[in-house]
Amino acid sequence: GWMHEKINELGDIANESGSRIVFSCGFDSIPFDLGVLFLQNEVIKRHGKPASSVRGRVRGMNGEFSGGTAASLGATMAALKEKPELFGILANPFALSDGFTGPEQPADNKPMLDEKLDTWVAPFFMAPINTKNIHRSNALMNHMYGDDFCYNEMWIMGPGDDGKAAADAVSSANPLSDAPEPGEGPSRESR
C-alpha cells in the first residue's frame, strides 16, 4: 500500500528531477529484479525477443528479517484492518505499474509441485513485493519484457513427500513471529 501511495505522491517529481524511487533493497528484491533484467537481456540477445514467462526460485536462506522489513509488513497488515480497500492494491501484481493491467499471473500463494524442477515449492513471503517491483521495472522500461509477461517467485522445498511436507509447513508459518524491532537486525553474523 505505502509504495503505491508514494509513487502517486512523488512519482512525477522524481521523473522531472531524473531521480529514481527504489523501495525494496533487501537480500532478495534487488537480485530478483536485476536477475530478471539480466535474463531477459540474454534471451533477447539470443532469440530476438523476451521470455514471456520467468519463474524466480529461492533455493535457501541464512539471513533474517531486518526490523524495517518486519515493521513495514506489520504496518501493512494494520493498514488493511483500517482500509480493507488496500487489499485490492496488495493483491494486484501490477499495482506499481502506473495503471497497466497485464495478463493473469501464475499462482504463487500455495504449495505446488514445480514439474520443471521436479521439486515442491512454497510461497515465498517477499514474492508479493518482489513481483510488483519486477512488473514495475518492466513498465518503466516500456514493457521490454512484453505486455504479456508473467512472473512468479517461490521457495524450493525439495522433492517427494519430504518436500511436500516442508512446503505445507512453510506456507502455514507466520514469518513475523520472531521478527526484530525496527532498527534492529539482521545481526552481523547473519549478514
PLM region spans:
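Active-site nucleophile and cofactor-binding loops and adjacent substrate-binding regions
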Residues: F23-S29
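Rossmann-fold NAD(P)-binding glycine/threonine-rich loop
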Residues: G1-S19
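C-terminal catalytic/substrate-binding lobe primarily of soluble NAD(P)-dependent oxidoreductases
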Residues: N15-G18, S29-I30, N41-R191
